[in-house]
């Protein structure tokens, strides 16, 4: 059996900016600011790296950021679920993804997994919104 690994954002799904829309208010609630969230490049980073990058850019120490992460994640995940509800059908699988996943999951030669910087629950929320959460047997996440 071969493992086939997929990223979430921009590979499997387009969530209409729900992640950024959720992170900003959650960061304000926990840290009182977001840093340069509108210009910061989220791609290729784990969720913890994104928060550290945003706040260290405005003078926070890594240790100060890390101290707030346990409080941030539940708020972020709640806001993410709300943001995904608001974007509705715009939280969708990219073209051809569902057909590809249907073929791969039906073929016993393959096991589909996730490799993503998203928190595990954040990835699952995004995939549920896109209608493909049940296609993945395992994964590595930004929360690991």
Question: Can you name each region flagged by the protein language model?
Answer:
Residues 22, 122-125:
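Phosphate- and divalent-cation-binding pockets in alpha/beta enzyme and binding domains
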């Amino acid at each position: 059996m071969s493992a086939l690994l997929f990223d979430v954002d921009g590979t499997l799904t387009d969530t209409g900016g729900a992640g950024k829309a959720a992170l900003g208010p959650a960061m304000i609630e926990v840290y009182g600011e977001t840093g340069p969230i509108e210009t910061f490049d989220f791609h290729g980073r784990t969720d913890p790296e994104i928060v550290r990058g945003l706040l260290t850019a405005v003078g926070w120490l890594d240790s100060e950021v890390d101290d707030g992460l346990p409080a941030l994640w539940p708020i972020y995940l709640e806001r993410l679920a709300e943001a995904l509800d608001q974007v509705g059908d715009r939280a969708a699988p990219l073209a051809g993804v569902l057909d590809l996943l249907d073929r791969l999951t039906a073929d016993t030669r393959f096991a589909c997994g996730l490799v993503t910087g998203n928190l595990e629950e954040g990835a699952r929320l995004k995939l549920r919104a896109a209608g493909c959460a049940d296609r993945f047997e395992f994964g590595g996440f930004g929360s690991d």
